[in-house]
Amino acid sequence: MAKKVIKIVKLQIPAGKANPAPPVGPALGQAGVNIMAFCKEFNARTADQAGLIIPVEITVFEDRSFTFITKTPPAAVLLKKAAGIESGSGEPNRNKVATIKRDKVREIAELKMPDLNAASIEAAMRMVEGTARSMGIVIED
C-alpha cells in the first residue's frame, strides 16, 4: 500500500543554495521533514543550474519521509537572464527595459514546455511573450 501524503510544500529556491534558514527551514520543519537531508539532496540535484531559481514541490508522507520534484525556472527569471537585466519595468506599458529576439523566446518556451499546459510550441511561445510584455521587454523578429 502507498504511503499516506500529509503535506505538499511548494518553494522557489536558488539552485544549489538550499539551507536550513528561512524560507526552507520553517516550511519543512512544520511538516517534520529532515531539513538537512532535503538541502543536501536538492543542492546535489540542482548544482548544474547555478544562478537560477528552481521551483520545487516537496511531498511529505506520514512517516516523515519525503520526495520532491524540481520544475523548470520561472519564465520571468529566464527572460531576465536572456535580456541581461536585473528586474523588469515598473511601468511596462510606458518604459521598455530590454529587447530580445523571437529565437530566444522559442528557446525559453522549449525549455519551459514540460511545465506549461500548452499543446504546441507556438502556444508556449505566446505565454512566454505575454510574460515578457508584462515585464517591459520588447520582442523583435
Curated annotation (Swiss-Prot):
Assigned keywords, A-Z: Methylation, Ribonucleoprotein, Ribosomal protein, RNA-binding, rRNA-binding
Post-translational modification summary for this protein: One or more lysine residues are methylated.
InterPro entries membership: Ribosomal_uL11, Ribosomal_uL11_bac-typ, Ribosomal_uL11_C, Ribosomal_uL11_C_sf, Ribosomal_uL11_CS, Ribosomal_uL11_N, Ribosomal_uL11_N_sf
Ribosomal protein as UniProt keyword: yes
One Pfam assignment: Ribosomal_L11_N
One term of GO molecular function: large ribosomal subunit rRNA binding
Alphabetized PROSITE patterns for the sequence: RIBOSOMAL_L11 (PS00359)
UniProt xrefs under HAMAP family: Ribosomal_uL11
Known role: Forms part of the ribosomal stalk which helps the ribosome interact with GTP-bound translation factors.
Protein name in the entry: Large ribosomal subunit protein uL11
